Amino acid sequence: SENQTMDDLCVLNYEDEILRPFGEKLMAEKKVQVMYFSSLRALKDGIYYQDGEIRIAKNGETELLARTDDLKLLGLHNFENVMVASAMALHAGVPMETVRKVIQEFAGVEHRIEYVCEKDGVAYYNDSKGTNPDAAIKGIQAMNRPTLLIGGGYDKQSTYEEWIQAFNGKVRFLVLIGDTKEKIAKAARSVGFNDIIMADNLKEAVQICHDKANAGDAVLLSPACASWDQFKSYEQRGELFKEYVRAL
């Protein structure tokens, strides 16, 4: 905010205990316009996510920006990104309808819970950047449908129990590929998850998911492993996943 003026906008997270009073100080000193966003509560002034809706509030009056079911992006962290980007665009004078259209059409950054397409009522997501269990946990947490999950790859000596426990009833089948498939299967069984299918390669895994999925399900590539056992990079793994999905 140091180089901003009252013509500018500073967008801050209302739930951050440091940023909230910082914003109040900026407003009191009339240094810059401040807009808060929140994913935990409705705001009287600001932009917030609640009950599947992103709303903009001014002086207690609210307007619906978008329902999150209409977004291709998934996950609370992405809804927060949408709120910040929308606040900045609206401040810059972009019409509400244009902002709404863009956020509904934006499919995300490549290989990061990237929406690929929907076939026969099944949505496909590419999270090839989920190269470790912590990153892959965010991938599964973002899913809002019963999910068939493709995991496995190069062994970076990770442990997988915490990732599998994060499935939290969402995962119908875990389809495993790569060097770690036996290690992950053992970890899964140790925490009570037994719906495991082994595949020889990514192409076969995609076909298995297609055959097992029901309309309303999601298929997610979020391997929790690096790609170097079968691929040059996570980017190549993600591109091949998309190619195999589109060829179904």
Segment roles from a protein language model:
Residues 1-123:
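Acidic, Mg2+-coordinating active-site environments of NTP-dependent enzymes
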Residues 88-96, 101-111, 115-248:
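ATP-dependent carboxylate-amine ligase
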